[in-house]
Regions:
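The feature captures the beta-strand-to-loop junction immediately N-terminal to the Walker
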Residues: 33-35
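Helix-to-loop junction immediately C-terminal to a conserved catalytic motif
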Residues: 48
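Conserved ABC ATPase "signature" region
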Residues: 109-142, 190-193
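Conserved ABC ATPase signature
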Residues: 146-150
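Conserved catalytic motifs of ABC-family nucleotide-binding domains
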Residues: 167
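Catalytic Walker B motif of ABC-type/P-loop ATPase nucleotide-binding domains
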Residues: 171-175
Length: 252
């Protein structure tokens, strides 16, 4: 699905991502953990196209994507969410989700004049898809409400719905559990599992160790820009390098 080969990203003399190589298999939920400053978010930004790697290769389903713009990577089926979602606050939940699909005819001024029936038909299809995914994440009762009224956890669900409407095959989730109450976190986890069973692959940054250990197979561990190890929850929790670098012996 996704592979990195000797991926490096430098800012001045600092290597935020340092010679990282990995392969994500199809239909897996992979965790990415490490202490603050380990390079996890920079790695995400390289994969999603927000940062161009200084060196190395990224391939999505065999095709090079390193250096591509975020919209081109998104169009190839790779989407990401952010630790702090920022929906358009004065637009409704439905309108926020409707923004995501690419190549909407109604975005072209001339199309509204020359092919209004086609524009209207596509808009109806986009609305139906948006409502489907809003219902999937459990926000149908808020579909017509402005996004500004949503809680932090609800905003994460909105962001998930917004990427799902574009039908990605790989989703990068940046701390989906951060600042989320237990009830909404359970909903988020249930949706991730359901999507994975439908064939969606996930790479997840998360500091909630209980969540990572129970949900993710495998788990990758970064520290100081390097990938220390990849393995099962049991293997990672017993690896002395991981304990020294991040877990501090807290996991038995």
């Amino acid at each position: 699905m996704l592979s990195a080969q000797s991926l490096t990203k430098s800012f001045g003399g600092n290597r935020a991502v340092d010679d990282v190589s990995f392969t994500l298999k199809d239909e897996t939920i992979t965790g990415l953990i490490g202490p603050n400053g380990a390079g996890k978010t920079t790695l995400f930004n390289c994969v999603a196209g927000l940062h161009a790697p200084s060196s190395g290769e990224l391939r999505l389903e065999g095709e090079r994507i390193d250096g591509l713009a975020p919209d081109r990577i998104f169009a190839r089926g790779l989407a990401r969410t952010f630790q702090i979602p920022r929906p358009f606050p004065d637009m409704t939940v439905l309108e926020n989700v409707m923004l995501a699909p690419l190549d909407q005819q109604g975005e072209r001024f001339w199309a509204n004049w020359l092919m209004p029936a086609r524009v209207a038909a596509q808009e109806r299809a986009v609305i139906a898809q948006a409502r489907h995914w809003i219902d999937f994440v459990g926000l149908s009762h808020l579909a017509d409400q402005p996004a500004r009224i949503l809680s932090g956890g609800q905003r994460k669900l909105l962001e998930l719905a917004r990427v799902l409407v574009a039908k990605p095959r790989l989703i990068l989730l940046d701390e989906p559990g951060a600042g989320v109450n237990p009830a909404l976190l359970e909903t988020i986890v249930e949706r991730i599992v359901a999507l994975n069973r439908q064939g969606v692959t996930f790479l997840i940054i998360e500091h909630n160790m209980d969540l990572v250990m129970s949900l993710c197979r495998p788990i990758m561990v970064m520290a100081q820009g390097k990938l220390l190890t990849t393995g099962t929850a049991e293997e990672v929790s017993r690896d002395p390098r991981v304990i020294d670098a991040y877990l501090g012996g807290a996991i038995a």
